[in-house]
């Protein structure tokens, strides 16, 4: 069975129902993946509707090119390029933006992509293997301080400093052992350092997450695309974001809350509340996968979906 067939889209019906409020509108799928959300969006759009999808992964682009629908187009780039990419296509406003964050099952399950500590493979971790610096290349040059900061901040790993020192010590042995360039060896190094075990988690989980986030600039791109989505959404348009770990969800939560609240004003100033600008967003809901979905797809367990609506022009 192919990777595409093994991928299960999380919160499929809930996300699409929240996103498509105007069937003749322009929707954006910021993370095409293997097309689960995009195909469901197309099924809900009217003939005058339009869907523009983004993805960095060349394999996702290949899958997207198999969709023969005049309403659909795919952009081979990060969703961080959304504002410019839509402007180049003459799109000024959209009725919905969907972001399904993180890695897809086919990416994790393919050892050649270097995302997983469960199977040995090249230490790559790039969403787009044709662009940028691989995990192995970064590990070959990063200082103890940089390694510590990335593993601590992006992996929330309390043994970050010890892991960083072990990685630099391994690098010093490169002349004798060769470069650190496989996921198996990275997982082994981390496992030797992290002696405690979180229930249901491999000791390398946090470090792999941190390196992947750094290599792909995931959190920086998320900040950029949230700002872009806010400016692109028409009045009544929806922003729907599915995240899978606390770092992403925290950014999304704070963004939505900040733009759904009236600006703070010193109460000593003679400004009436009615004279303040209205916040551009209204928070609609926060949703989680059902027990049935988690039972069928355990990877959905950590998912949280946040929905906000643009309420000002």
UniProtKB/Swiss-Prot annotation:
Broad enzyme group: transferase
Species of origin: Burkholderia orbicola (strain AU 1054)
Chief localization: cytoplasm
Signal peptide annotation: none
EC number: 2.1.1.199
Catalytic activity: cytidine(1402) in 16S rRNA + S-adenosyl-L-methionine = N(4)-methylcytidine(1402) in 16S rRNA + S-adenosyl-L-homocysteine + H(+)
SUPFAM superfamilies named in the record: Putative methyltransferase TM0872, insert domain (SSF81799), S-adenosyl-L-methionine-dependent methyltransferases (SSF53335)
Name of protein: Ribosomal RNA small subunit methyltransferase H
Annotated GO biological process: rRNA base methylation
A Gene Ontology cellular-component term: cytoplasm
Pfam families according to UniProt: Methyltransf_5
Coiled coil: none
Listed HAMAP family: 16SrRNA_methyltr_H
Stated family: Belongs to the methyltransferase superfamily. RsmH family.
Function per UniProt: Specifically methylates the N4 position of cytidine in position 1402 (C1402) of 16S rRNA.
